């Protein structure tokens, strides 16, 4: 039970710190408009998946952002090691958060359904 709370606290702390690191330390223009939406940490605290969203829907922008984040991973992990008070800094992996796109898709479907009901 205590481990579950620790994982949750660590996830929140990693999310807060990675947002700060992206704003203040990473100078890569490819990652300037990235928002960290969530973090999943494994039960053994060895791996963390960091979910992000971007404002653009272009596939080319998504690829550029992913490349920029992959290049900055070692810097971000090093900074996390200095900022977090844990024994081992988790290995981090960035993944695009598709929930925002999915929510937009559902809203569009509901709008279409609502507009067809009026006729």
Swiss-Prot record:
Biological function: One of several proteins that assist in the late maturation steps of the functional core of the 30S ribosomal subunit. Associates with free 30S ribosomal subunits (but not with 30S subunits that are part of 70S ribosomes or polysomes). Required for efficient processing of 16S rRNA. May interact with the 5'-terminal helix region of 16S rRNA.
Gene Ontology CC terms, in alphabetical order: cytosol
Keyword Cytoplasm among UniProt keywords: yes
Native organism: Ligilactobacillus salivarius (strain UCC118)
Lineage: Bacteria, Bacillati, Bacillota, Bacilli, Lactobacillales
Gene3D superfamilies found in the cross-reference section: 3.30.300.20
NCBIfam families, sorted: rbfA (TIGR00082)
GO BP term, pick one: maturation of SSU-rRNA
Keywords from the named record: Cytoplasm, Ribosome biogenesis
Subcellular location: Cytoplasm
Record's protein name: Ribosome-binding factor A
Main localisation: cytoplasm
Underlying gene: rbfA
Domain of life: Bacteria
